[in-house]
């Protein structure tokens, strides 16, 4: 679209790409995640309903999706505002807010946070995973889904005039459901019409990212403008990682700060540490992919906020960047990952 070409679209309007600054490409500022509640282990039912307290923090960190209140990030606007002010003070410029239809997107709240903190906030269009799809969504044709997504970018979403600046995170499960496949096809069609950035939440299986890209390609999507999220919990084998990287998407490591013994959504996954994530970044850089790497924290629960003893939105800037530099990643490469790559991805074609 000529009106958006060469621009970035935030909840406060269009800006020039050079205004973005350091960017976290996968975060949530207000959402609810009740759709993904995991029943607590026998004997832990009381903990799952108890207030968030320091004495329960370790249990909460290991079982974040079994605590009802923890899934309600939308209750913490004031805490998130404080976090964003700290993020800006630490050198942050932009947050890509990945909350889509199905997990309580709140565009007026995002606009308010952007106004009050000075942080650029970019909202996401589209739909999350199948379990959050309404009957109305399931009945929509690919053409209708495309029209909805395009309208959320061009005119505003959820009955507001606040416009989304990316499509996503578009949610997929494993195996990908028919409803999710339609949304992926609609995403590709909308991207073709708009020239806009897309970001994907793959199912929790190492085959999922490749399958998503295949569906998008067959539907005419622009893979060079597409981000594959959550690679830190999806692809571990270096050979498989390079095979996927050759497909041309952005490669996002977005769970920095999340270090758990057992990953509740897939016990077969050994969640990497932040040090291991940094080593993965270094490997990809050495293999020639420094122009395709993005990083973030994917904060989507209360316990990840500093208010509750979590790492917060400034963790990468304060802690991970020094670690990257100490492990031989150059300042120029860090700037590519935090500034240049997000800028290229977020700019409409």
Swiss-Prot record:
Q: Required co-factor?
A: a divalent metal cation
Which enzyme class? hydrolase
Q: Which domain of life is it from?
A: Eukaryota
Single GO cellular component annotation? cytosol
Known EC number = 3.1.-.-
What does it catalyze? Answer: N-acetyltaurine + H2O = taurine + acetate; N-propanoyltaurine + H2O = propanoate + taurine; N-acetyl-L-methionine + H2O = L-methionine + acetate; N-acetyl-L-isoleucine + H2O = L-isoleucine + acetate
Localization per record = Cytoplasm, Cytosol
A molecular function GO annotation = zinc ion binding
InterPro entries per record? Metal_Hydrolase, Phosphotriesterase
UniProt: a divalent metal cation 2 binding residues? 169, 201, 230
UniProt xrefs under PANTHER family: PHOSPHOTRIESTERASE-RELATED (PTHR10819), PHOSPHOTRIESTERASE-RELATED PROTEIN (PTHR10819:SF3)
What role does this protein play?
N-acetyltaurine hydrolase that catalyzes the hydrolysis of N-acetyltaurine into taurine and acetate. PTER also acts on other N-acetyl amino acids (Met, Ile, Leu, Val) and N-propionyltaurine, but at lower rates.
Name this polypeptide is given: N-acetyltaurine hydrolase
- Organism, per UniProt? Danio rerio
């Amino acid at each position: 679209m000529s009106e958006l070409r060469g621009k970035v679209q935030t909840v406060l309007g269009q800006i020039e790409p050079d205004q973005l600054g350091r960017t976290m490409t996968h975060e949530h500022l207000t959402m609810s995640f009740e759709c993904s509640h995991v029943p607590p282990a026998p004997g832990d039912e009381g903990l799952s309903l108890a207030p968030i307290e320091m004495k329960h923090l370790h249990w909460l960190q290991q079982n974040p999706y079994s605590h009802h209140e923890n899934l309600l990030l939308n209750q913490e606007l004031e805490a998130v505002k404080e976090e964003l002010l700290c993020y800006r003070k630490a050198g942050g410029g932009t947050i890509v807010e990945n909350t889509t239809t199905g997990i309580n997107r709140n565009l007026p709240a995002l606009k308010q946070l952007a106004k009050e903190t000075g942080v650029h906030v970019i909202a996401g269009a589209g739909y999350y995973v199948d379990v959050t799809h309404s009957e109305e969504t399931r009945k929509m044709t690919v053409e209708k889904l495309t029209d909805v997504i395009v309208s959320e970018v061009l005119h505003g979403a959820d009955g507001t005039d606040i416009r989304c600046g990316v499509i996503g995170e578009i949610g997929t499960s494993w195996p990908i459901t028919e409803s999710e496949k339609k949304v992926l096809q609609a995403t590709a069609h909308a991207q073709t019409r708009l020239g806009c950035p897309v970001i994907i939440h793959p199912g929790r299986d190492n085959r999922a990212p490749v399958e998503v890209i295949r569906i998008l390609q067959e539907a005419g999507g622009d893979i060079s403008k597409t981000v594959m999220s959550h690679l830190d919990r999806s692809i571990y084998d270096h050979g498989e990682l390079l095979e996927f990287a050759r497909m041309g998407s952005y490669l996002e490591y977005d769970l920095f700060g999340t270090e758990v013994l057992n990953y509740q959504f897939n016990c077969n996954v050994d969640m990497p540490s932040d040090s291991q994530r940094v080593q993965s970044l270094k490997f990809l850089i050495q293999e020639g992919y420094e122009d395709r790497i993005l990083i973030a924290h994917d904060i989507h629960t209360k316990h990840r906020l500093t208010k509750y003893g979590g790492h917060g939105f400034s963790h990468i800037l304060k802690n991970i960047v020094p670690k990257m530099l100490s492990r031989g990643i150059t300042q120029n490469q860090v700037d590519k990952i935090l500034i240049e790559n997000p800028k290229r991805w977020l700019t409409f074609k």
